[in-house]
Amino acid sequence: IKTEDITWEEKPSSEGCKLAAAYPTDNSSVVTQNIREWMNEQLGGTYTGSLDDGKKLLEYYGTERAEQVKRDIAEIGENTAMDVSAYYVQFKKAFETEKFITYTSEIYEYSGGAHGGESLSGGVFRKSDGRKFGWDMFTANGKEKLRGMIKNGLKSKFFKVNSDEELYERLLDENARYTFPLPETAPVCRPNGVEFIYQQYEIAPYAAGIPTCTLPYDSLENLFTVTMKPLIESTTDSLALTYNPIVKR
C-alpha cells in the first residue's frame, strides 16, 4: 500500500517529544482505514478528527503529551528530572506481501527516574478486508505447542544460553519452569518468520530489554489456522521478497 512518511516534533523541543509514521494514504482502501484506526488507538484512542490527515493525528497526541509534561513540571517543581523528559513514537511498515501488511509501533517514554520505558507491538492486517490478526493466527493447540518453541528460541537466540536452567535464572517468574508463558503482546509477521515479543519486565528484568524471538514460517506451518495459511503462503511472493530474502534462523 502507498504510504507517506510524516513526523511531528515540538519546537523548541525541550521535552524531546517526537512522533513519526509511515502513514497509509489510499483513502479508498479498507485496510488503510483499519491501520489508521489502530494507530489512533495505540496513541490513546481519543482523537476524533478525520484520519485522512495523518499529520493532524500526530500533532494532536504530540501536543497533548507535551502539554501534560509542562503541567506535571509546574505541579512538581522545575528542579526535577522531568525537565529532561522524552516521548518518542514511531509507526513502521515492517513487512508487506500481496495479501497482508505488518505494522509495528515503537514507543519510548522517560519522565524522570533511573531510566525510561519502551514498548514494541504490532498488527498484521489482511489487505482484502482489513482484518487484524494477532494470536488468532494460531489454533488453540498451536498456541500450546508454541510455548516450548518460544522458550527454545529465547534461550538460543535472545539470551544465548545453553540450558533451560540458565534461561530460568534470567527470568522473573519461577512458574516459567512449569508452564512457559506466552507473550501478552500479539505476534507479528516479519520477512523471515513470526516474531514473538515480551515487553519490559514481563518475563525478565529491565536490563534484559524487550525479549523477542523470531521463528521461521516453515517451523510453524502446522500451527496456523486455515484462515491464516493463505496469508503465510504469500510470504514468498515477489512483493514480500523485496523486503528481505527468506532467512532461516
Question: How would you describe each model-predicted region?
Answer:
Residues 1-249:
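Compositionally biased intrinsically disordered regions enriched in Thr/Gly
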